[in-house]
Curated annotation (Swiss-Prot):
The gene is ruvC. The RuvA-RuvB-RuvC complex processes Holliday junction (HJ) DNA during genetic recombination and DNA repair. Endonuclease that resolves HJ intermediates. Cleaves cruciform DNA by making single-stranded nicks across the HJ at symmetrical positions within the homologous arms, yielding a 5'-phosphate and a 3'-hydroxyl group; requires a central core of homology in the junction. The consensus cleavage sequence is 5'-(A/T)TT(C/G)-3'. Cleavage occurs on the 3'-side of the TT dinucleotide at the point of strand exchange. The keyword Repeat does not apply. It comes from Stenotrophomonas maltophilia (strain K279a). This is Crossover junction endodeoxyribonuclease RuvC. It catalyses: Endonucleolytic cleavage at a junction such as a reciprocal single-stranded crossover between two homologous DNA duplexes (Holliday junction). Mg(2+) 1 binds at residues 8, 141. Homodimer which binds Holliday junction (HJ) DNA. The HJ becomes 2-fold symmetrical on binding to RuvC with unstacked arms; it has a different conformation from HJ DNA in complex with RuvA. In the full resolvosome a probable DNA-RuvA(4)-RuvB(12)-RuvC(2) complex forms which resolves the HJ. Belongs to the RuvC family. NCBIfam families: ruvC. SUPFAM superfamilies: Ribonuclease H-like. GO terms for cellular component: cytoplasm; Holliday junction resolvase complex. Its cofactor is Mg(2+). The active site is at 8, 69, 141.
Length: 173
C-alpha cells in the first residue's frame, strides 16, 4: 500500500488530499482538508503557514509520494506569481522530508479523472466523489487535491504494469 498526498496549491487556500493505493492501482480515501492561509498578516507569513501545515500533515499521515498540480497561466500576473510561490513553498515543504514529487497539468488531471481534459470543475468534484465512494460534496480545492493524487495513482499503476517509473510512464524525465 502506498500513501499519496495530493496538493492543489493556492496563495490563500491550498487543498490537500490523501489517498492510499494498493498494488493493483485501487484507490481509497484517507483524508482531505484545506490549508487556509488568510490568517497571516502578509504573504511570507502565509507561505510559512503553508509549509508548517504540510509538515504537520506529513508527520500525521506519513505519505510516501506527493502529486501536485502544475501552475497555469492566470490572467493577473500578480496572481500567477503568488500561485507559483505557493507551489514552490509546498514543494519545498515535502522535498525537505525526502518525498518524491510528481507534477501534473490541470488538463492531465481532468483527463485522468473525468476522461476529458477540458472537463468542468463540477465534473471533477463529482467523479472524485464517485471514485473514492464519498457521501459528502467536496469543495473545489479538496476535489482538485484528491484528483491530482488519483491521477498519480493511475500513472503509478500503469507504470508498475509496464515495469517503468511513473515519470517514464508519463513520458517525463
Amino acid at each position: 500500500m502506498t500513501r499519496i498526498l495530493g496538493i492543489d496549491p493556492g496563495s490563500q487556500r491550498t487543498g490537500v488530499g490523501i489517498i492510499d493505493v494498493d498494488a493493483t492501482g485501487r484507490v481509497s480515501y484517507v483524508h482531505h482538508q484545506p490549508l487556509v492561509l488568510l490568517g497571516a498578516d502578509d504573504f511570507p507569513q502565509r507561505m510559512k503557514l503553508l509549509v508548517l501545515g504540510l509538515a504537520d500533515l506529513c508527520r500525521e499521515y506519513e505519505p510516501q509520494e506527493v502529486a501536485i498540480e502544475r501552475v497555469f497561466m492566470a490572467r493577473n500576473p500578480d496572481s500567477a506569481l503568488k500561485l507559483g510561490q505557493a507551489r514552490g513553498a509546498a514543494i519545498s515543504a515535502v522535498v525537505l522530508r525526502d518525498l518524491p514529487v510528481h507534477e501534473y497539468a490541470a488538463s492531465e488531471i481532468k483527463l485522468a479523472v473525468v476522461g476529458r481534459g477540458g472537463a468542468e470543475k463540477q465534473q471533477v468534484q463529482h467523479m472524485v466523489g464517485l471514485m473514492l465512494n464519498l457521501k459528502i460534496k467536496l469543495q473545489a480545492d479538496a476535489a482538485d487535491a484528491l484528483a491530482v493524487a488519483i491521477t498519480h495513482a493511475h500513472v503509478r499503476a500503469t507504470a508498475n504494469r509496464l515495469g517503468l517509473s511513473a515519470r517514464q510512464a508519463w513520458g517525463r524525465k
